[in-house]
Amino acid sequence: MHSLFLKILIYSLMQCVLGQAEFWDYDENVTQIEEDFKIDDVTRILKRVGNYNRNAYPLLDQDLATHVDIQMYIEGMSSFHAQSMDFQVDIYFQEKWVDHRLQHNNTKRILVKDPKLFGLLWHPDLYFANARTASFHDVTQPNFLVWIYPNGTVWYDCRISLTVLCMQDLARYPLDSQNCGLRILSYAYDEEQLIIRWNGGNPVEVNRGIRMPDMHLKHIKFYTKRDKYATGIWSSAVAEFHVDREITHHIIQSYIPTSLIVIISWFSFWLDVEAVPGRVSLSITTLLTLATQSSAARMALPQASDVKAIDVWMGTCMAFVFSAMIEFTVVNYCVRRKVRTKIKPRGLSEQVHDMVAQYREKKDKFNNGNCEISYEMALQPNEDNATVQRNFEKKEVREMNQASLFVRRSLLPTSKRKTIEDRINRVEENRKNAQKIDRYSRALFPLAFIIFNIFYWIYYLKYAGSNSPELLL
């Protein structure tokens, strides 16, 4: 009984294994039959034609040009690089043409996925004239397909990644707009043999999810043209991309920091004219910081002789900072030049008048004018600056009632005292003039910078922006 059960179990297992094997063999056979059917359809067509020449375009026997209709779907697009003058684009590229030699009686279109089989058919040798590099996608299978319709229409679809050359006009950078084109033409067939046309009313479609960090795709223009070469005239199709540069990044990274640096340089106008270390260090620091900022802005640009909008901005900001340094130099020179002729401390004229008044009071108290005040020790015109300053700071000069100040009887002549006071007044007058220059600078520098901003932004955003750059292919 047990042996019978064991035999039945073994027999059942063998049937399952054999049945599964037959199933997989059947599935492989079906797949192979389907592939053979597709290949047989194409080879049968080629055999029926007999002398099919894959190197001859379809209408060669009629001496007519073959029309190739093209269209594309832009899957992705990267930034437009100003330094390398190119951009990357990922597209699905479709071509359609009619080859009457491939007409067949099938009710449905024939799908061709084998690159070798597609190589047996004639197809246009289109290429992208201004592409630096181009590559097909092969993951997980070669990304292409071919449909052959009963009337001989051939539809070819593939996915291509391109690095496209774009000669940009950077005169308005970074407030610029660019026109970059993608030019398509045949390599071997001229206009008498092959004519390229855009297919349908909207042959260039764009993935709406495309986002570029520094550019905005405004619109796409497409047209056909005739290119003249020494060997003849070639038909070509052009897709022209109009892009605007995003300015937000440049405002945050360049325009706002440099504007703040210029404003900081104006702080020196509120410092005292004799605060030399503070004003010099402030001017030099702002100038060096602005130079560093300008160098960083130029690193993303090619070395070109054209004057760009960012160059105008950086140069003007540097001129404002340098002008602030010159203003301080002029003011400080005026003050110091007068000090060298007769250095007097601030309020020195008032001190002289006080000394004269005190002297007259003391003089009335002395009988017969035994001792009289002499200014000459403290106000000698030929003494150096440091000595004059120290003499006026001495206690003996400030306290006129001490006997040590009365060194001789003779009074200082009125004419000499007048000369000293005139010199002191001129020092004070020049100091006030220097302060007046600072006050004017506090208003004129910001006003000039505001006027520059108005003209700068109006010109580059409105006037210069109305002239779109010409497409260079």
Swiss-Prot record:
Source species, domain of life: Eukaryota
Subcellular location field: Postsynaptic cell membrane; Synapse; Cell membrane
InterPro entries for the chain: GABAA/Glycine_rcpt, Neur_chan_lig-bd, Neur_chan_lig-bd_sf, Neur_channel, Neuro-gated_channel_TM_sf, Neuro_actylchol_rec, Neurotrans-gated_channel_TM, Neurotransmitter_ion_chnl_CS
Cytoplasmic compartment segments: 272-276, 330-439
Main location: membrane
Matches recorded under Pfam families: Neur_chan_LBD, Neur_chan_memb
Keywords tagged on the record: Cell membrane, Chloride, Chloride channel, Disulfide bond, Glycoprotein, Ion channel, Ion transport, Ligand-gated ion channel, Membrane, Postsynaptic cell membrane, Receptor, Signal, Synapse, Transmembrane, Transmembrane helix, Transport
Membrane-crossing residue ranges in chain numbering: 250-271, 277-297, 309-329, 440-460
PROSITE patterns xrefs: NEUROTR_ION_CHANNEL
Lipid bilayer topology: Multi-pass membrane protein
Disulfide bonds: 166-180
Family per record: Belongs to the ligand-gated ion channel (TC 1.A.9) family. Glycine receptor (TC 1.A.9.3) subfamily.
The protein's name: Glycine receptor subunit beta-type 4
